[in-house]
Amino acid sequence: MSQTAEAKSLWFMNGHVTVHLAMAENAGGISITEHLLPTGFGPPYHVHRDEDETFYVLDGEIRCKQADRVLNAKAGEVVHLARGIPHGFKVVSPGGARLLIVSTGGFEAMLRAASMVAASVSLPEPREPTPEMQSRLAQICAENGIELLGPPID
């Protein structure tokens, strides 16, 4: 059993993240995060040098692209995204989506560095990223072994 004093409720981009298990709380080097995301949400197309990510779709539907392969995943389905292979995803369901992401490596550190502590378990006010915000995200990602390759997928 473990519990961290670090913030567990974060606003990342236009989504909300709850850290259920921090890397510091286990010897296995994994994090488990829950993501509440609005329709149309998608991170820049990117590649992780050190992390594998496994998405379990709790609610809604997402479209994932890994290299040249594209698939949709609905509630109850799992998508594994291996390190070293470019990927991205987009929320395609009208009511948004809720994902559980199990990740190895420094994904959680990037989330914490690029997020604000959330005032509540809710979506933040939506906003378009400014060039400064995009530059800051690219720098934080690079510091955590993630290379941004392009815009979010369609």
Question: PLM features: residue spans?
Answer:
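A short, N-terminal "cap"/entry segment at the start of jelly-roll beta-barrel domains
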Residues: M1-I30, L123-D154
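Conserved short histidine dyad/triad with adjacent acidic residue
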Residues: T18-V19, T33-H48
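Conserved hydrophobic/aromatic beta-strand scaffold that supports enzyme active sites
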Residues: V19, I32-E34, T54, V70, ...
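Short histidine-centered beta-strand/loop micro-motifs
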Residues: L21-A24, P44-R49, K90-V92
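Short acidic-glycine-tyrosine-enriched beta hairpin
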Residues: E25, E61, D68-P86
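Ligand-binding loop in jelly-roll beta-barrel domains
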Residues: N26, R63, R83-A109
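Glycine- and acidic-residue-biased ligand/ion/polar-headgroup-sensing regions
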Residues: D50-D52, Y56-I62, G76
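A contiguous, mid-protein "functional segment" used to position or interact
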Residues: P94-I140
